[in-house]
Curated annotation (Swiss-Prot):
GO terms for molecular function: aminopeptidase activity; metal ion binding; metalloexopeptidase activity; phosphoric triester hydrolase activity; proline dipeptidase activity. PROSITE patterns: PROLINE_PEPTIDASE. It comes from Colwellia psychrerythraea (strain 34H / ATCC BAA-681) (Vibrio psychroerythus). Pfam families: PepQ_N, Peptidase_M24. One of its GO terms (biological process) is proteolysis. Its EC number is 3.4.13.9. Gene3D superfamilies: Creatinase/methionine aminopeptidase superfamily (3.90.230.10), Creatinase/prolidase N-terminal domain (3.40.350.10). Its cofactor is Mn(2+). InterPro entries: Creatin/AminoP/Spt16_N, Creatinase/aminopeptidase-like, PepQ_N, Pept_M24, Peptidase_M24B_aminopep-P_CS, X-Pro_dipept-like, X_Pro_dipept. NCBIfam families: PRK13607.1. Binds 2 manganese ions per subunit. This is Xaa-Pro dipeptidase. Keywords: Dipeptidase, Hydrolase, Manganese, Metal-binding, Metalloprotease, Protease. It comes from the Bacteria.
Length: 443
């Protein structure tokens, strides 16, 4: 057993015990006997026999690191050893993944399913007391489930998913280690003058990934394309001049996601100075992640800090407080500061005040925040402030009553660079923050 597997093996029992206790509590509360969690199944494109890439149910991979096996099931009740119904068909068309020995296998009663259509033989006979958790409602209905994705139950689980176990922390460190290695390869490709497409290939090759292995579609943008927040076009043509490079790209380990962003300037110029300033601003925001602090308040503080950057670089003609009051900062920073991170890139539970799912509203002037929850120990966040020169938003500002608050000549000079986003992945501990991304060597 490798050192990493030994560490995971030592941490996994406590993780399973935590899930068992959580399941027992929510089943008692909702007067249910158990949960039947479906890994999912392949979905065919319309009028086609080809399937979309399979993406496992996050509630399934919460229990065990099986992320590419459709038609599998978990039956859990919080007390007995969970049952894993593992799909292993006899199939000469496709590769079948046998169930290998692992550190987690002993925690499950394992049953092999050879035909997906015969799963009912292995599921509880009387399903009245069981809730189906998964996306295939038609399958659940056909099998006779009455309780399908009950909202109170999901609220409870989603709220508690905000707190990560030590096992989950280690999985997130490993996904960050992969992403850091790939980011370094991508940076080198940019500096040698590659195209967006070739940079993407360098990223994937460095960690042995295919296109569908990343937890989300990589954003690999050069020059003005850096102003498009979710740019995914991957131009194969090399630009005549390399000016800027923004990469927002992650990796996956055991179903847990890394989500890292970096921005680079090709030259040591004013844009490079702006990147350095935004990098320090990002680290200041990381330092503000403390138990008991509202993430909304941290976003608002960072929002004002970006206003100060705009003033210091003479992009605006007013002080930061005036820029906050007038609302012009949102033109340059139009998204939220970050989000919870875990089994999903934008992990669940970010807007919940309690395990009942009580919603915590975001301020009307900050509609794109992805979390409004109070920060607590063992939570994991991204911190990703940005500063962009987006033509459509700048046009709206220029046509507004606040146009005279902007130094348009200086702003126009930056349009060719697109924008800046810098994003790290952080574990909040009781006495300190663990910046996984920086600790693993990505500056």
């Amino acid at each position: 057993m490798t050192t990493l597997n030994a560490k995971l093996a030592s941490q996994y029992p406590a993780h399973i015990a935590q899930l068992q206790q959580m399941t027992k509590s929510v089943l008692s509360r909702e007067n249910l006997e158990g949960l039947v969690i479906h890994s999912g199944q392949e979905v065919k494109a319309f009028l086609d026999d080809n399937c979309y890439p399979f993406k496992v149910n996050p509630h399934f991979k919460y229990w065990l690191p099986l992320i590419d096996i459709p038609n599998s099931w978990l039956v859990v009740n919080g007390e007995d050893k969970p049952t894993l119904i593992y799909y292993q068909p006899v199939d000469f068309w496709h590769k079948v993944t046998p169930l290998a020995e692992s550190y987690w296998g002993e925690f499950f009663n394992i049953k092999i399913l050879t035909k997906a259509s015969e799963v009912d033989k292995l599921l509880p006979y009387d399903k009245k007391g069981f809730a189906y958790i998964g996306s295939h409602i038609e399958v659940a209905t056909a099998l006779g489930f009455e309780a399908i994705n009950p909202e109170p139950l999901l609220n409870y689980v989603h709220y508690h998913r905000g707190y990560k176990s030590k096992y989950e922390h280690e999985c997130l460190r490993q996904s960050n280690a992969l992403a850091v290695k790939a980011h370094q390869a991508a940076r080198n490709a940019f500096l040698q003058g590659d195209s967006e497409y070739d940079i993407q290939q360098a990223y994937l090759k460095s960690i042995g990934y295919g296109t569908n292995d990343t937890p989300y579609g990589n954003i690999v943008a050069l020059n003005k394309n850096c102003s498009i927040l979710h740019y995914m076009s991957l131009d194969k043509m090399t630009p005549q001049v390399h000016q800027s490079f923004l990469i927002d790209a992650g990796a996956n380990f055991n179903g847990y996601s890394a989500d890292i962003t970096r921005t680079y300037s090709y030259k040591n110029d004013k844009f490079a100075e702006l990147i350095a300033r935004m990098d320090q601003l990002m680290l200041n925001a990381v330092a503000g992640l403390k138990p008991g602090v509202s993430y909304v308040d941290l976003h608002i503080e960072t929002h004002r800090a970006i206003g100060q950057v705009l003033r210091d670089f003479n992009f605006i003609n007013v002080d930061a407080d005036t820029a906050v009051e007038s609302g012009i900062i949102s033109t340059f920073f139009p998204h939220g500061l970050g989000h919870h991170l875990g089994l999903q890139v934008h992990d669940v539970g970010g807007f919940m005040a309690d395990e009942r799912g009580t919603h915590v509203n975001t301020p009307a002037e900050h509609p794109f925040l992805r979390t409004s929850r109070v920060i607590e120990t063992n939570q994991v966040f991204t911190i990703e402030p940005g500063l962009y020169f987006i033509d459509s938003l700048l046009a709206d500002l220029k046509a507004s009553a606040n146009a005279d608050q902007v130094n348009w000549q200086n702003v126009d000079e930056m349009r060719c660079f697109g924008g800046i986003r810098i994003e790290d992945n952080i574990i909040v501990h009781q006495s300190h923050n663990e910046n996984m991304t920086r600790d693993l060597g990505l500056s």
